[in-house]
């Protein structure tokens, strides 16, 4: 029977009645609840587009997690399967194998993982968590599941040990007791080793928690128990008594056996190692302080830092390895965390970049009574995982195939590109491989377990991450993997900061002045653009050849002209009478002269960073073509950039901030437009004026309130952006409420590129304020506050109270009058979205032309027309004319994204220039012609044609028809929340709008009708890291930074959810357990006990009895038989109820059938009698009746 899907019914109802929504668009629901209704389409002929997407195409599920496990706590290794497991403080477990085998699983409780133990070659894993619960994980499936859990109620777990090929797990507790758990049934045995029986009766003090458990390699019936206070007990399991006891003055941290079972080594809190012989337990056989200073004979060695762990591994043909962490001398406080390797008389200290959490020695054999033959050491650091090769004398490290260095510098932004040009990955890899670090071990990565294949998903994917130190990393994300391709350092463009220069020249940000804020990449043309936190934009071009050249830089002065706002000139002048006068002579081939003014002198017209003035050698790859910097204005640093876009076809880059918009021609290296946001509207007003050119170096009076007035209220205003990226660049993942995080800095905050700095407030007073006037305003009086709160939900800020008369509706009257008082009353609008496209700039346009869509934080959309030279030759010499078209569109909330569709409903891609190597000496630039790809049909230029423009803000989405500028569809996405990220993506060859809301909802809407396809409460927003890094891409995929060190990928495609099992790797592969070595006749006779030890007979219920029920509680896991029985029972119950309902329905149908049969019999009888009556009176005349 075909499955009935109620969502199809809803899709059909929505499609059949698109105008059923409220025309007012009012909605009281939260995110994901909204109304879809057509706009004003009366009398407008509209082509109905057949949409192919339905709700069956969408489903949300997580796919894979990349990066280093955040806050690691435990490490385990299976020497036969060769897989590695890492536990974290948040209850997560990452299981790693060969490249492509990377699995993430999570404890539901979220408790920290204390210890991990593999059931070697059994496809299972035991985890002990901080809530005193043991879990058994099944690894014989691609998504590991918990089979059993055992919750200890009265004791806290401190240590676990599972002997090789044993089904009995030893569990040590904080009280000093040792319990035994059956792995198969996960039931506690009645056999318990109490601490008071393990120590001598004469001892009155508690030995402390159990810190070590291990069975003797020589005799499985003997258990070594280590207590924290320095006591070691050798327990005979059969006789249930202590065979010997060892006492030491210093606390014990770890113990390890010699493979022969005659000696064991302990590490202590005073930095010493003690070697004990079972034949003479009264005192240590050997005591050493590896890093202590040598003392005179008879004196105790100098105490050192604790040795937290030691491993004692033997080799057949060489001296044993003694490997330990810690133990350095106290007088070397500046020394970094270290791992010491002692091999014979040689001592090697490996210094680490981060504190050591755990380490394990990887050995050839799983049997503890054989020569271990160690070949590598896996070292788990707080922020890294390294593996040291022990087979080479210099102990090199293996090259890590996993992307464990995503957080090498904190991630500040991300971008995700699916279905890229296929040659890009090979090109980037071939360039990046030349710059890889050298000195790695020449052997293969030792963690090589599991199995993985490419699966059905073969299209190329690239992830780009921007970092706090200015680096940009390109990653190959194809086929559910992540591998480094290429690394770009943007800081090489600038001069290095001197010791005393940083505070003076870079007051915009206190730390990380090169932090990457936004990235824009065109894969087809290979043009790459990046904006930094210090208000700069760098344009990179890709080249296969090395070049040495000077870096071209432009300095742009972007400010608010108060005089123009307050006193409009009465005469009317054309907005752009002479474009050549608009091109400022700010092209600087020698770099910027960033000279710091002496103390007390107002800074003006200097950038935050200094571009290198000397010729710079640029290796193959991305090479800087142009640097654009915003400069200080009258002592005020430039505002951070909030939006960025570039067009390789037009040769134009545009960016904006809270002050205004800048448009630059990067072919001719000239500034085309530098205009405040308010001037974009004024260009269509009655009082039209020529906008200020950046080259006009006007000196404003010191009492200019527009740019400096608020500094009187906040003296520390110059420190305003120091906390902008603090929460993103610090690796402390302390949860911060969204409202507090967004308002952390009272002077600047950026959510999704929306700047909310109060320094960008415009002045609405009718006169220029003097210093005395400003001091009066400081008192606030009964008049209006000096600045207001922006109404956009994504632009929260700490500001003064908002008065009623200052509240502005998010609607905009298209027929604007010459008065701009309503705009003057508002805070300045930030440029939040930019988009280049061939479109209709005005209502009366009959053909498409190059346009720039500009979206603001107050929901306004301004179309700017770009008039380009007609030929390629003129493009390098003739100026580009940039004219605001006078077309305005409006939405609720800050504008987030744009996109266009042609009249057939196909998504239109912005035009681009085909890539060519700018440094190719074989081509003559003068004879070479630019190859442009225009992604629209020739029929779209015909008279009367139109296109659909999709605009999404943080509150709603609208679809406009151009050039008529009629709103066809409106969808009010949310009223109580706001959208953080929105993008128009391609799914199954159809376009749809994907949105991520602040309250965790992911919503998908079809285009152009904006019908809801999916609304899932996926992820509650707990910190701004997710908001800043969440991004959608084509083919139903998305990603975000789930922790400071990890990237989480997810899919909203039903097809990918169905095929996810085929894309993941197998953790378990059938491998025969290696056979134990033959010990020989003499070793078997004299080397130790040769008798077998039956743990089942000793620990089973028959001999040991049952454990107390109150001690531990057994919890069946979802993957266990009990869990499956429960689920099956639930299914059977549902089937039973369905069968009963079916029987009742069948009974009613039977009764109805009987009634129907009776009615049919009556009808036949009536028909028969009627026929007989007709025959009786057929031949009679009327007068015979």
From Swiss-Prot:
Main function: Plays a role in vesicle trafficking and exocytosis inhibition. In pancreatic beta-cells, inhibits insulin secretion probably by interacting with and regulating STX1A and STX4, key t-SNARE proteins involved in the fusion of insulin granules to the plasma membrane. Also plays a role in neurotransmitter release by inhibiting basal acetylcholine release from axon terminals and by preventing synaptic fatigue upon repetitive stimulation. Promotes as well axonal outgrowth.
InterPro entries, A to Z: Lethal2_giant, Lgl_C_dom, LLGL2, V_SNARE_CC, WD40/YVTN_repeat-like_dom_sf, WD40_repeat_CS, WD40_repeat_dom_sf, WD40_rpt
Gene of this entry: Stxbp5l
Family: Belongs to the WD repeat L(2)GL family.
Provenance organism: Mus musculus (Mouse)
Knocked-out gene: effects: Mutant mice are born at the expected Mendelian rate and show normal body weight development. However, they display reduced sensorimotor gating and impaired motor performance.
Presence of the UniProt keyword Protein transport in the record: yes
Positions carrying Phosphothreonine: 567, 595, 1092
The protein's name: Syntaxin-binding protein 5-like
Residue ranges, annotated region (Disordered): 15-44, 567-601, 747-770
Cellular location(s): Cytoplasm; Cell membrane; Membrane
Record PTM: Phosphorylated, leading to STXBP5L increased turnover and subsequent de-repression of insulin secretion. Phosphorylated on serine residues in response to glucose or phorbol esters. Ubiquitinated by the E3 ligase SYVN1, leading to STXBP5L proteasomal degradation.
Keywords for the protein's UniProt record, in alphabetical order: Acetylation, Cell membrane, Coiled coil, Cytoplasm, Exocytosis, Membrane, Methylation, Phosphoprotein, Protein transport, Repeat, Transport, Ubl conjugation, WD repeat
Chain positions of WD repeats: 73-106, 113-152, 157-193, 212-246, 252-284, 306-348, 356-390, 412-489, 517-628, 642-704, 831-888, 897-968, 973-1017, 1031-1054
Listed GO CC annotations: neuromuscular junction; neuronal dense core vesicle; plasma membrane
A GO term for molecular function: syntaxin binding
Modified residues (Phosphoserine): 573, 588, 592, 598, 762, 764-765, 770-771, 792, 799, 811, 819, 821-822
Residue stretches making up the v-SNARE coiled-coil homology domain: 1120-1180
Positions carrying Omega-N-methylarginine: 708
Subunit organization: Interacts with STX1A and STX4.
Ranges annotated as biased composition (Polar residues): 747-768
